[in-house]
Every structure is written in C-alpha cells, then in structure tokens.
Amino acid sequence: MLLGVNIDHIAVLREARKINDPNPLDALSICKLSGAEQITIHLREDRRHIHDNDAKAIIEQSSLPVNLECSINSDIIDIVCKLKPSRATLVPENRNEVTTEGGLDIKGNFEKLQKVIDKLHANEIEVSLFIDPKDEIIELSKELEVEWIELHTGTFANIYAMLYSNLASTHHSIKELELSKSELKTKLSKSIKQIETSSKLAKKLGLKVAAGHGLNYQNVTLISKIPEIEELNIGQSIIARSVFTGLKQAIIDMKELIKND
C-alpha cells in the first residue's frame, strides 16, 4: 500500500502565528527516509496554509512525486500547469469549510472538468478526481479519461469516530450521527461496503484507486485491507502524532499499519 503524506498541516502551524516556521519544505527528506512514497499538498484558492511559493519549492525540490490537490478554478489550474506536479487531484472547495466536505460534483461540472483535465494532460500532468464512493460517479470519472480516482473516506471516518472514539462527548460531536451504537455499526458496515464496491468497479474500469480524508491510526486498517486500493493520502493524523513522536516515527507507524503482508 502506497502512502502519500499530506504536509498541509505543517503550513497550518506556521500560519497560526504568521511566521516562517515550521517550513513544510523541511519535511520532504524526512518523509522519504521514513518510507512515504508521495508528498501531497493542497493549494487552496484562499491560500489558508500552502502558498504558491511553498508549492513551487516543494515540487522543485522533492525527490518524491508530488500530488497537488486543487479546485477547478481557472486561475488555480493555470498555476498548476506552470508548476507541473506529478499529479493534480481535483477537489471541491468551499471557502467556509474547515476541510474538504465531500467529493466533486462530476455530473454538474462534467464539461468544465473535461476542459480542465484536457489542459492538465496537455501539460503532462496525471489527473485524479476526489469523489464520493458511488457507482455513477465512478463511471463518469472513467468517461473523463483520468488516470486515478481518490475515494472520499470522510463519511466512513466520521461514523467510526462517533462509534469508537470520544468525539460524541465533545463540542465537535457530529449532530446527524448522534445515534445508537447499533445504528452507527450498521452505518459503518454500509460505508465500508460502498467503498469496497466502488473500488472494485473502478479497478474493473481500468482506473487506479486511492483513498483519503479522515484516515487515522485507529481506522486506517479497515480501508487498507481493500485490495483494489493502491494508495492512501493521509495528513492531519500523521502531523498530529508527529507533535509527540516526531515526523519520522509518525510516518513509520502509519506505514506499519497499512502494509500489505
């Protein structure tokens, strides 16, 4: 199982004090030496963490492939084409969101996506679509002739957290998931099944399958066991653990959990 380490949250720490430390660039060699196969960053329209100069330096200096997450905003796509990351993962964006809340609306943006994908391909950039695990969306993604899809695991992660962590007893409790344990277990089972079904369909259609969002040290093994998924992109939980263990050990710990024996 390949691991892409999202280093956005190093920039989040920097931006919390509006200074130049910590520098996300310093994470590159640690990620490689610790066994990561990819660096993932998100160049948001609002530049809330990673900035243009960060993205440029990371892409130029990383010895690992860089997966650049971005919206389909034309100005952002122009920047991505100049930066030339190994891969661009197209994601939805909402300025008011804390983090990405769901997958792309493929059906509603099909024509615009086709133009964006064609432009990225013309610049020799591999393309992935960040999507919800639904069969119709998988099939539309295939029509768009992308190389990858990344399945949004946020719903799965939220259900898992409400069931097996103390999230429900905190001020971050997810109101719509304040259900009985039996109801949450049923929802979790259905969520995993849908991810499995979508992964199988995508693989059958010739798409490479990644997954990410909300994955952590507690829930990741349920996703890493799905054989059709080749890659996981994980950020916040790794950076959070690194505060206590150091980044190298945090990555090693995650690699150990997701390895395929």
Swiss-Prot record:
GO terms for biological process: pyridoxine biosynthetic process. The record marks E150 as: Transition state stabilizer. 3-amino-2-oxopropyl phosphate binds at N6, R17, G214, G235, Q236. Homooctamer; tetramer of dimers. The active site is at H42, E69, H213. This is Pyridoxine 5'-phosphate synthase. NCBIfam families: pdxJ, PRK05265.1-3, PRK05265.1-5. InterPro entries: Aldolase_TIM, PyrdxlP_synth_PdxJ, Pyridoxine-5'_phos_synth. One of its GO terms (molecular function) is pyridoxine 5'-phosphate synthase activity. It catalyses: 3-amino-2-oxopropyl phosphate + 1-deoxy-D-xylulose 5-phosphate = pyridoxine 5'-phosphate + phosphate + 2 H2O + H(+). Pathway: Cofactor biosynthesis; pyridoxine 5'-phosphate biosynthesis; pyridoxine 5'-phosphate from D-erythrose 4-phosphate: step 5/5.
